């Protein structure tokens, strides 16, 4: 199957301009399980975007071979508002310059409207309950009237993610700890050499300056 793309246009806050969010879908629309992945809601945290960039061709190939059982939605660059915020040569993508809000705060709370829709209908079938609650959450989001660009972004992303079985919101930091990944057998089987396997792994980690061994 071909990759499916969707473009969400945000309301313009400046005459003559507008921003968009690109959404990529793999697998069968509406199929389960549904996985939603977004990156760079803090817009200067770009490793998540890079991770999804490298994931895309693998998903495209898997989709062509019919290997994706459910639906996978990627939003590699979820925050075009923050992407545009440059101060001199510095990228300031964590807070919205207009409202001073952290981009990853103040998501839309639909718990009350959902509760009002479903509390008399909850039954003993867990799967039916989940389906009903997801439907009510989407209805509540569709009833929202966002007042500005940032609110629109939040509502639209929650529409994509609120009924997902798995949600991955990719972040990073300005510092990355160096990890050493080793196979289980390399760690527990031995001895190999004077240190044994565990000792050899620890010695290698020390030589490399590794901070975490997995």
Which residues does each PLM region occupy?
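Structured catalytic-domain cores with a bias toward divalent-metal coordination
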Residues: 1-214
